[in-house]
UniProtKB/Swiss-Prot annotation:
InterPro entries: AtrR-like, Transcription_factor_dom_fun, Zn2-C6_fun-type_DNA-bd_sf, Zn2Cys6_DnaBD. It is found in: Nucleus; Chromosome. GO terms for molecular function: DNA binding; DNA-binding transcription factor activity; DNA-binding transcription factor activity, RNA polymerase II-specific; zinc ion binding. This is Transcription factor TUR1.
Length: 1122
């Protein structure tokens, strides 16, 4: 391993240039993009003057129309030919003219041969014959004078010059033929604008495109690049739409779930509607003004790292003006090379569409395949600084000429700083000193088969290539990411080596988390590379699961900040700085972090950190990793069964959730400050809503309508043998009902402050409570179903968040039951609470935050005298639990809400036994059935009778909860001998707390069969991570030593020395942990074989039993029976 491979970019540029091609190599643009008859490779251009002129001009429909039947090519008079540039080999080639060096006028010339550049003679001579007339003035603004360009035909038609009527009609026929070849969106939106402005030079200066593919002027390109890209407007104004790359680009933008999904997403839909409805003359200016607030400025910093700054920084405007006022020679040079945006991000619109000119440099990916050249491997670490996390050799496409051109324009006398990296060998030794190599391989396998399915931001082939490359271990972001992966995966395996205390499963990954925090302090670890962003995101998820909320929110905020710094929230489709893989990975990474931000904001009552209005990045494409290459999509067909389809559906639900969160928060009135009150109303721009969240509810219905049937949760999905389909469909189903539940909870919470006074209002209050309860029960029933089938390993911390929300909602529903009308919903709510707390305790073996959420719900039930016989934690050993939260008292107590009806003076009796049995049960005694007398809330006792404090649970989570040393915690009520009696004195001393066992043993059978479980019935596994080293059989992921794991990713002393392969074939069996199975873990297979028969109950059956109040949680999970 040679650390010298990891130095600055200057050492690898010659290698990249050498591998790019030889002097006589035909232009890749010719081979990869053009299917037109006029497009010919520059290496085969004849040396005759007329042929050179024909083949070096960009192909236009007007030139194609010359061969069309019935077209009069003699319509152009002698004055037209006089205006053509005298292209003769006697003058210097384009490159020598730009560089102002001597050219020997050969084709190709000697300087171009020596520098491996294409030699062209496109630029017109400056000694062009200047004919007089109106047509010269029109064409002179175009830069390159094309005889059949639209501007020249328009000008000729306008002047006439006394042509005969037949000649004029022939010209009109030719013009109509040209217009028919123009796509409707381009024609309607821009053609008239171009016609009006081509010769005037006013406004933003729209100009004719030349061979470099300038197209629309720099101002419109810089401000409306994304819009123009979605309009499929190429550099030559759309007159040649036949290139294969251009068609691929058009299909790329449409590659979403289905036509319905495509119609509702993306920028092209609203842009077309907006532009086509306006006057053609004003379309460009309106679009310019619309995009003014969303200007982006991507740049490379001092080490070549791509970064972003927004409009208020002033850089976008300055760059726009600088590009618009650049000297003509520099503008022509940048246009001819077609690489302005790759170096200084000048013209996103022009660069987003591949040029069809044969002499224009093709828009190649910014990185090459890691296996293509040894040079690619050598340059991999520096590539991470520029192309973030994906692949190797990212600077392979940059030639030395491009770097020289960049230096000529910006800081020509300065060189970039070398990218600071680590010593790969030292980094490898430090990490493997904490995480053994064989265990690391297993944890990586586990991550790819579990957590990655929830947040699939990785391009797995590129990641596995980097994982096997020793040089990558010198990159700080990559090392942090590997440690973060191992930290999160440690919660999904049963190997004692992942635990800080081998006897305590709750300490799994803690030592890795400490290592991660140390690595984050290393130089360059905080740079906004994709691996650094992803590492902070995964570490935040682990911290949430650990219950360390302050650190979790800190890491989540860091990941979002790095996203903003790297511009992940902005679209980069218009820039060639990033290849197709990196563009998609940026999208996936950002939307994963965006969704988690909304999830945590909803659970903890915090405002989201980033909003949809701050972003313009599009949704990830519906394409699996095996069909995505640096050049683009291999198979462009839309597969509704793709795993990315479920991910996009998840993103859209979280977008709706943001609207729900925002609608629940109204701007403050600031009664003592009129200025702040006015400013708050102005900034919020939110009007009062009589029917709140109606728009969000309609969006939710639209989401449900366009969801592909394959991912709908129905009988067919529940009976599927594919665990990925089952778990993803149930995940979407739960998330949909989570959003609905928050909407209904927000609506009925209004009746707490202002109780219903009429029968109609009381009926509406009851209906909202019932709907919220049904959504909560649906979430709980789905998770019970997944858990009993042994497939909870495919889920993560989001399960705890959803169950916590469902439990709080059920508590709120029960506390709203103040009259006899609400009696039917009490028993189902209490039964749902019992199952909810049981699942949270069951999941606490993997994530401590589950125990915290269960204890908090239990404590609310105790304070409010809600009789929940909470299931215990499996295999608990006994340790006191901390006081997770204690509400801060207000100086003025809030009076309890008024009863809903005149005949009701207090809350109902919450004991389901009393509600369902017409016997002489004690309805008013707390000791027997924990009922509440009709005297109101006064009998609850203690200062906790403040109902407003009970409802405002979200504010409590800002109070840091105590963390037991070593991560151990019990519950306050779970294992009390008499669970029905909750008269426990919670005071400063914990001496009276009933002790519940800690988690000294795995939460069997949960942590054993719901880790990495087999699926032998599914046939071929889809994850095949293997190497040529001896398999590590020292432990079993299931804890069953009789069936050890035999396919580890063992590595030799050198990092990643083993050969890694990955099989992506779905084969109709999904993707994930089923291929990681051993014979000792057959619960997933059992669940799939039994389906809804045998001892397993379907989610619908569980929900029905809960609604009846007759579901027995302890009969399903006997290890948690009271």
């Amino acid at each position: 391993m040679d650390p010298s491979l990891l130095h600055s970019s200057e050492e690898v540029k010659p290698t990249s240039n050498t591998s790019s091609g030889g002097s006589n190599y035909p232009s890749p643009n010719t081979a990869g993009q053009s299917h037109t008859t006029d497009n010919t490779s520059p290496s085969t251009v004849p040396q005759s003057q007329s042929t050179s002129q024909t083949h070096n001009q960009p192909p236009q429909p007007s030139s194609q129309s010359q061969s069309q039947p019935g077209q009069d090519t003699s319509a152009l008079d002698d004055n037209e030919s006089a205006k053509r540039p005298r292209l003769r080999l006697a003058h210097a080639c384009d490159r020598c003219r730009r560089r102002k060096i001597r050219c020997d006028t050969q084709h190709p010339c000697t300087p171009c041969q020596q520098s491996n550049n294409v030699c062209t003679f496109e630029t017109p001579s400056r000694r062009t014959v200047k004919s007089k007339g109106n047509s010269e003035r029109v064409s002179s603004t175009g830069g390159v004078k094309r005889p059949h360009s639209p501007g020249r035909v328009f000008a000729s038609l306008a002047t006439g010059r006394g042509e005969s009527q037949s000649n004029l009609e022939a010209r009109l026929a030719a013009l109509e033929s040209m217009l028919r070849d123009v796509p409707p969106n381009v024609h309607n939106a821009f053609l008239s604008t171009l016609d009006a402005r081509l010769g005037s030079g006013t406004g933003v200066g729209l100009k004719e495109g030349g061979g470099g593919g300038e197209g629309v002027g720099v101002a419109v390109e810089a401000l409306a690049g994304t819009s123009l890209a979605n309009l499929n407007l190429p550099g030559n104004l759309g007159y040649n739409m036949g290139g294969s790359e251009l068609n691929a680009q058009r299909r790329l933008g449409q590659n979403t779930l289905s036509p319905d999904w495509a119609a509702t997403g993306g920028l092209s839909g609203w842009l077309n509607d907006a532009v086509l409805g306006k006057k053609k003359e004003e379309a460009g200016m309106d679009e310019l003004a619309k995009r003014l607030g969303g200007m982006s400025f991507f740049y490379e910093d001092e080490i070549g790292q791509a970064k972003w700054q927004g409009a208020t920084s002033g850089f976008p405007l300055l760059h726009l003006l600088a590009a618009h006022n650049a000297p003509k020679e520099e503008d022509e040079a940048d246009s001819a090379d077609g690489d302005v945006s790759g170096e200084m991000m000048a013209s996103p619109a022009a660069d987003s569409i591949p040029s069809t000119s044969p002499n224009t440099s093709v828009i190649l990916p910014r990185r090459i395949s890691s296996s293509s050249t040894p040079a690619g491997r050598a340059s991999s670490v520096h590539a991470k600084a520029r192309s973030s996390s994906i692949g190797l050799g990212a600077i392979g496409r940059r030639a030395s000429s491009a770097d020289r051109r960049k230096k000529e324009r910006f800081f020509p006398d300065r060189t970039p700083r070398p990218h600071q990296t680590l010593n790969p060998e030292a980094s490898w030794k430090v990490i493997t000193g904490v995480i053994p190599p064989d265990l690391m391989d297993t944890l990586v396998r586990c991550y790819l088969s579990t957590s990655h399915l929830l947040w699939p931001f990785l391009h797995v082939p590129s990641f596995l290539t980097d994982y096997a490359n020793p040089a990558q271990w010198g990159e700080p972001g990559f090392t942090c990411f590997i440690v973060a992966v191992c930290t999160l995966s440690s919660r999904h395996v049963d190997d004692p080596r992942v635990r800080a205390n081998p006897a305590d499963p709750s300490t799994a990954g803690k030592q890795y988390f400490e290592l991660f925090k140390r690595l984050r302090d290393l130089p360059s670890a905080d740079r906004p590379t994709l691996y650094s962003i992803q590492a902070a995101f995964l570490a935040a998820i682990y911290a949430f699961g650990l219950g360390n909320l302050s650190k979790a929110f800190s890491l989540q905020a860091e990941s979002i900040t790095l996203c903003l710094d790297g511009g992940l929230h902005r679209s980069v489709d218009a820039y060639d700085h990033f290849d197709a893989i990196e563009k998609e990975t940026r999208k996936r990474t950002f939307w994963s972090i965006y969704a988690w931000d909304k999830q945590s904001a909803a659970l903890f009552g915090r405002p989201p950190i980033i909003h949809l209005r701050d972003c313009d990045v599009t949704e990830p494409l519906i394409v699996d990793d095996e069909n995505l290459s640096p050049e683009g999509i291999k198979d462009e067909s839309i597969n509704s069964k793709s795993r990315m389809c479920a991910f996009v559906a998840t993103i859209r639900l979280h977008v709706i959730l943001e609207g729900v969160i925002d609608s629940a928060t109204q701007p403050s009135a600031f009664p003592t400050s009129p200025f702040l009150a006015r400013a708050a109303a102005t900034i919020a721009r939110r009007t009062a809503q009589n029917e709140t969240l109606r728009d969000e509810e309609e969006l939710l219905e639209e989401w449900k309508r366009i969801l592909p049937k394959y991912w709908c949760y129905d009988t067919e999905t529940a009976n599927s043998r594919d665990p990925i389909r089952i778990t993803q469909a149930e995940r979407l189903h739960c998330l949909e009902h989570l959003v609905k539940m928050i909407i209904y909870r927000h609506r009925f919470s209004g009746f707490v402050a202002m109780p219903a006074s009429t029968a109609e209002e009381r009926a509406r209050h009851l209906d909202l409570c019932r709907k919220a309860m049904q959504c909560a029960l649906t979430i709980i029933a789905d998770h019970v179903h997944i858990s009993q089938r042994g497939m909870m390993t495919y889920y993560g911390v989001h399960v705890i968040h959803q169950l916590a929300q469902a439990g709080r909602t059920l508590v709120a529903v029960i506390l709203n039951c103040r009259n006899a009308d609400f009696r039917p919903i009490i028993a189902p709510s209490v039964e749902g609470l019992r199952s909810c707390v049981g699942l949270l305790r069951r999941f606490s073996g993997r994530y401590l935050c589950g125990l915290r959420s269960a204890d908090i719900i239990d404590e609310f039930c105790r304070v409010c005298n809600i009789p929940v016989d909470s299931p215990r934690v499996p295999n608990s050993a006994g340790r006191p639990s901390p006081a997770w939260l204690r509400p801060v008292r207000k100086r003025v107590a809030t009076p309890p809400p008024i009863a809903d009806s005149p005949g009701s003076s207090g809350m109902m009796n919450f004991d389901p036994n009393t509600l369902t049995a017409n016997s002489g049960a004690h309805a008013s005694g707390v000791n027997d059935n924990m009922g509440i007398s009709a005297g109101g809330v006064g009998n609850i006792g203690g200062p906790a009778s403040d109902l407003d404090a009970l409802f405002n649970t979200a504010a409590y989570f800002n109070v840091p909860g105590g963390e037991v040393s070593g991560g151990m915690a019990g519950t306050s009520t779970g294992s009390a001998p008499n669970v029905g009696n909750h008269n426990v004195n919670i005071g400063p001393s914990n001496s009276f707390l009933p002790t519940l066992g800690g988690l000294g043993e795995a939460s069997a059978p949960y942590d054993r069969f719901e880790t990495l479980s087999p699926n032998a019935e599914l046939g071929n596994g889809n994850t095949m991570l293997s190497n040529y080293q001896d398999s590590h059989a020292g432990f079993s992921l299931s804890g069953d030593t009789d069936h050890p794991m035999g396919n580890g990713l063992g590595t030799s002393a050198g990092a990643g020395a083993g050969h890694i392969s990955f099989d992506y074939g779905l084969n109709g069996h999904g993707f994930g942990g089923e291929s990681l199975a051993t014979k000792g873990m057959d619960n997933v297979s059992d669940g799939l074989k039994q389906g809804t028969g045998g001892s397993n109950l379907s989610a619908a059956t569980i929900l029905s039993l809960m609604e009846e109040g007759s579901f027995d949680y302890g009969s399903i999970f006997t290890d948690q029976a009271p």
